[in-house]
Structure formats: structure tokens, C-alpha cells
Amino acid sequence: ALMLQGVDLLADAVAVTMGPKGRTVIIEQSWGSPKLVQDVANNTNEEAGDGTTTATVLARGANPVEIRRGVMLAVDAVIAELKKTLNDELEIIEGMKFDRGYISPYFINTSKCEFQDAYVLLSEKKISSVQSIVPALEIANAHRKPLVIIAEDVDGEALSTLVLNRVGLQVVAVKAPGFGDNRKNQLKDMAIATGGAVFGEEGLNLNLEDVQAHDLGKIQEITEQLDITTSEYEKEKVTDALNATRAAVEEGIVLGGGCALLRIGIEIIKR
């Protein structure tokens, strides 16, 4: 009886969060979690990346044999109906990450600095003068694209100009990661990844004042933060997303929010 009370306690709290209009539940952890049901939910999450709420509700009182029997009776009809709108689509986007944040907090546009479809200006040298960055700013403004500047450092008049132009132009300045040869190599890697050039690199006669659009790298999306703080909640979100992605790659996905279930239910009733 006590075990059933524990199962009901968790299942009742979780059940109301199910579906597209699920409610938020706050639970004070003053004692141990009901491990039996928790294990069911964890195993489901590890296997499928989602479905923990459904698994918890089913574990509370549904007969798994009867559920399987009902599923098997309808599975052929469900698959046939889903195949009518089935499309294979898998997109893998390459990216890179480095441990440096934006130089000034004035660059942020949300809790982080996030740009899409941006130009990238790479420089091995420190950028201090306004004249050296004006051509790149003009190119970005003419093409209506954000500009990300990654250099040894950006200071003085150059930094002040970037901050002032932040209102009319999406721009962010970032210190290049690493030191010495390591920094040079990382900038070269960025140039290869973005299709741009590294200004100030030995052997290349490139001046910032002579920059052309083809000298700038191009990226689909970039996120910059002052520093990285990882919470347990964020870790869980990343883990859920990773598991869901793996499941999607292996088995595909259907419309969420109960839409697929609703549509299939209508077809099953017709039959």
C-alpha cells in the first residue's frame, strides 16, 4: 500500500504536465524520490530521449501486456497512415567552439550575443584605430549582415566606435583564443571553416583598410557569452536534446504536441 501511495504521488504530479497544454509542477524534495517509477522514467528517457511523462503514467496502473496488444493491433494501420506524409530529411551543420567571450557587455542582444548569417573578420593583430575597421563595417552594413570581429584584441577608438555603432549595426568583438603560435593556428582553423582570410598573417599582404567582401568569413549562426556557467537544469536540457536527436536520426520523428496521435486516432476509428 505504501509503495502504491508513492507511485500515485509521483504519477499524479507528473500526469498534469502531459501534452501541449501541460501545467508546471513544483515539488519540494524533503525525502527520497519514488525510485521504482523514477527508474521507469529514466530508462525511457535514455532509450527514446522523451516520453518520461507517458511512461510514468503507464507505470502507475496500466497493464503493459494489454497496451502492447492494443499497439500491435493498430501498428500496421498507423505506419501506413504516417507513411503518406513521410519525408527523409537529415541536415548536419559543422561548427566550432572556443573559450573566449565578447570584449564588452554592450555587445549583447539577449542574455548572450547571438547572430545569424554573419560576416567574420579575423586578425592576428590588435585593432585600435577606427580607420582599420571602417571598411569592414561598411561592407557588413551594405550587405545587411552582422559582423563578428575576432582579433588579438580590440581597444581604444576602435572599440568605442563598435560600441557606438551597435545601435545601427549588429557587431561584436571577440578576443582570439590561445597565445602565440596556438592562437595563429586557431585563427587559421577559423579561416578555413568560414572561408575567410586572416589579416596580419605572415606571408599574406592583407591590410584591414583594404578588406573586400570575399576576405570576410561567413557563418550561419554564432553565440557569444561573457563566460560559461553550466547548471544542472541546462545539463538536463542538453541531455534530453541529445537523446531526442539520436532517436530522431535512428527512427525519425512525428508532429509533436499530440498532433500525430490525434490524426492517427481519427484514422483508426474510421477503420
From Swiss-Prot:
Residues where Phosphoserine is found: 30, 33
Residues reported in the UniProt entry to bind ATP: 50-54, 257
A GO molecular-function descriptor: ATP-dependent protein folding chaperone
Top enzyme category: isomerase
Residues modified to N6-acetyllysine: 83-84, 97, 112, 125-126, 145, 188, 237, 270
CC per GO annotation: cytoplasm; mitochondrial matrix; protein-containing complex
Tissues expressing the protein: Detected at higher levels in caput epididymal spermatazoa than in cauda epididymal spermatazoa (at protein level).
Cellular compartments annotated: Mitochondrion matrix
E.C. numbers: 5.6.1.7
InterPro entries membership: Chaperonin_Cpn60_CS, Cpn60/GroEL, GroEL-like_apical_dom_sf, GROEL-like_equatorial_sf, TCP-1-like_intermed_sf
Modified residues (N6-succinyllysine): 84, 97, 112, 126, 175
Record bears the keyword Cell wall biogenesis/degradation: no
Keyword line: Acetylation, ATP-binding, Chaperone, Isomerase, Mitochondrion, Nucleotide-binding, Phosphoprotein
Biological process per Gene Ontology, one example term: protein refolding
Catalytic function, reaction form: ATP + H2O + a folded polypeptide = ADP + phosphate + an unfolded polypeptide
Domain of life: Eukaryota
Family to which this protein belongs: Belongs to the chaperonin (HSP60) family.
Free-text function comment from the UniProt entry: Chaperonin implicated in mitochondrial protein import and macromolecular assembly. Together with Hsp10, facilitates the correct folding of imported proteins. May also prevent misfolding and promote the refolding and proper assembly of unfolded polypeptides generated under stress conditions in the mitochondrial matrix. The functional units of these chaperonins consist of heptameric rings of the large subunit Hsp60, which function as a back-to-back double ring.
Subunit organization: Homoheptamer arranged in a ring structure. The functional units of these chaperonins consist of heptameric rings of the large subunit Hsp60, which function as a back-to-back double ring. Interacts with 2 heptameric Hsp10 rings to form the symmetrical football complex. Interacts with HRAS. Interacts with ATAD3A. Interacts with ETFBKMT and EEF1AKMT3. Interacts with MFHAS1.
Protein name: 60 kDa heat shock protein, mitochondrial
Species name: Mesocricetus auratus (Golden hamster)
Underlying gene: HSPD1
